[in-house]
Amino acid sequence: MVTNITKRDGRRRKFSITKISSAIEAAFKETEEKYTDEDLDRLVQTVVDEISKDGAKTVKVEDIQNVIEKTLMNFGFHDTAKQFILYREERNRVRDTKSDIVKTIKEITESNLKSSNILRDNANESGATPAGAYGKIASETNKMYNLLNNIDRKYAIEHKDGAIHIHDLNQYNLTFNCLFAPVGKLLRHGFDSGTGFLRAPQSIQTAAALTAVILQLQSNQQFGGIADDNIDFDLAPFVDLSFKKNLKTELIRYEEYSGSPACAGDMDKLLKTVSMNQPVERLNMLFPHKCVEKAIKKTDDDTHQAMEGLIGNLNSLQSRSGNQVPFSSLNFGLDTSNCGRMVSANLIRSQMEGLGDGLTAIFPILIFKLMKGYTKNPEDPNYDLYQRSLECLARRFYPNFVRVDSSFNAPYVKYREKIIDVKGVLSLELKVRGRDEVEQVFVNEDVVFDQPKYEFEVGTGEYWEIAAIENGMLKLRKLIENTTVSTMGCRTRVLGNINGAEQTTGRGNLAFHTINLPRLAIEAHMAADTVEERKAIFFEKLQNILQDVKGSLLDRFALISKKTYESYPFTMQQGLYLTSDDEPHDVTDTVGEVFRQGSLSIGYVGIAEVVTLITGKTWGVDHDIDDFALSIVKTIRKFCDEQQKETHLNWSCFATPAEAVAGRFANIDKNKFENEKKLKDVDLYRIFGKGYYTNSHMIDYSVNTSLVNKLKTEAPFHKLTNAGHIFYYKLNGDLSKNIDAVKHVIDAMYDADLGYFTVTMDSDDCLECGFHGIINDACPKCGCKNEDKFVRVRRITGYLTGSPRKSITKSWNDGKLAELRDRHNI
């Protein structure tokens, strides 16, 4: 007779027939199958007899459950047996989750960075510090809570099994991904920080300081990147305010020393009519030219200090999660006004100079906008800023580049238009775009400018481009800056919008999931022998998993749409998200309608591995399979476009950065398929043996390829991946000594119709002697061999990592370290 049971954790308890009866009865109640008390008694007795037949005094809980399932089936209660199995699986899932939580907390609190991938899943957030460990415990616990309670069981299993990856699972039930913050709007009108109202700044220094505050406050109410899509346009008005202050100071000083009036009439009234955006020669007609010169110089110094402070703050405000600076990005380059150009020039200058210790600033990610007529060609007004950006890139990794006028970005660019009647006027003094020069232009000759050369002042310091002079009319246009594409540093972007304005400002990605494409290819390879059969099976599986990802993303959207304005006191109540302040609202109002301005994205990794598994060929080498690879992403993009029409939400296709997921997918698949006989004809090292899957559609990093070939292979994917993409190519040597080569490469990327791109390199610093260059085992200058004295800066996805506190060898997860080992072409 059985007297004891052994639970799964090894504990022993007294055997109870009543518990067997209760378990069977509970299963019956979940079905419509009829049963009697006699049926229940017979079932229980049969179970008891079966577990007692060997004479054992103690049995395991799982053995009893196995007998219950078998007995129910034998007695014909099939539905009840199925229900009992489901109940058992659910209990196992709950039990396993609780066990996982304990194991995870133990790993976080008792491991170090070198031994724990959990502590290194984000290269710019250390899990080793007290605040970091505390955050990791909360993060990992909420991941498990979401898998257990908030996510459909099917999708949770697919995530745990590695078929898909639900990104930022720790924030699944809390908030959204990223946002292009309307920094200019908040600076112009002031904002409530939560502890008090901050009025509009009156100088560039204060504006830059408040910009860091805005980005920091917003980053705490989301989980992804925070960006300003046009920092030059946003900060330019405050450069002008500083100029007027500085000019007034110089004028007063002039009057004190000279004893003569510095200007004709009332000084304060006159200052209201001028702007630093106006040509210097006009300002010199109103004020002593030395006063103007000194005011401009002082304003430039102020702007330089402001940009230094902005970069410094964004590298030191570790308030996000108590252990992380805001994942910030600044887009710039298209403002051709004097004030806007001063912002851009000093942003580049400050990045070039580095932080206080001369090291490279990891944040913010600087992104320079390339566009013909503005920045790209020698005749463009901001071409000089492009040249400076290239010099900065060669020394400091940043800026990255976004092509505003690519074939897939240009259609979104919009202009305001205005017509000025100048009939009867023979000529006008017009400002040359981006310069202080003024030229006399005859207006009685019709001319249309393909690339506008001149500007016309329509308000104090506000200049519009002259697109044409026709029949005595000036046809003016002004770029609407937030219709020009911007990107988060990692690559995420938004632009198209079926629910409102097609702009970047005030919008962002809500959530994205990534599909493990190599998993589908592994299963297709095992199921068929011919390439065509494998392709057919692969695409069938892809369609099925796309439906599941759609369902999971819609569930996530529904969950966060139930959040209220009080959940996001800064984002919603201060009007950062587009339409959030269109109408009066109560703090208990839900935010679902506002979130319809954002996007849901489906990402992918492992095109390189898929090509090998399905065709046996090498991505980026055998170009006869290019169409097949492209058709995979076309399928995902088509699906996203279809869902946009069906659900009336913004869906987009994403070339996943794959920081943590690259290694996770590969390790799961290695454990699952490494010994499969049907994969014996595959070089599994090229698939998951190397420890990671290749980012999105990129050529395998171990392939030593040319720039031309890499562009030919990867460029066509950019027009398909409207949620974000990036292209980079690795150059060797000291790039600061070969700016022409850097320009040649960036120009080639621009010409290839890419959307977002940059070059990358290795960059090391020795803290012992200050050497900057490439350090192998020892510093070539002082001979130091202490790794802790070396700062090795590397690009991990779209952003950088590397500092004395977060050396790449300490902060990168195993998958990314394996990738770094293989890198030849990025």
Which stretches of residues belong to each language-model region?
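Metallocofactor- and cofactor-centric catalytic cores in central/energy metabolism, strongly enriched
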Residues: 301, 305, 613, 808, ...
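Conserved catalytic cores of very large enzyme subunits
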Residues: 90-94, 100-596, 617-618, 622-795
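Charged, amphipathic alpha-helical regulatory modules used
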Residues: 1-108, 808, 816-822
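Short, hydrophobic beta-strand segments
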Residues: 3, 47-53, 328-329, 609-611, ...
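Long insertion/accessory domains within large nucleic-acid-processing enzymes
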Residues: 780-826
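Amphipathic, well-packed alpha-helical segments that form the structural scaffold of globular domains
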Residues: 25, 48, 550, 554, ...
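Contiguous, well-ordered alpha-helical segments that form the cores/surfaces of helical PPI scaffolds
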Residues: 600-613, 634, 795
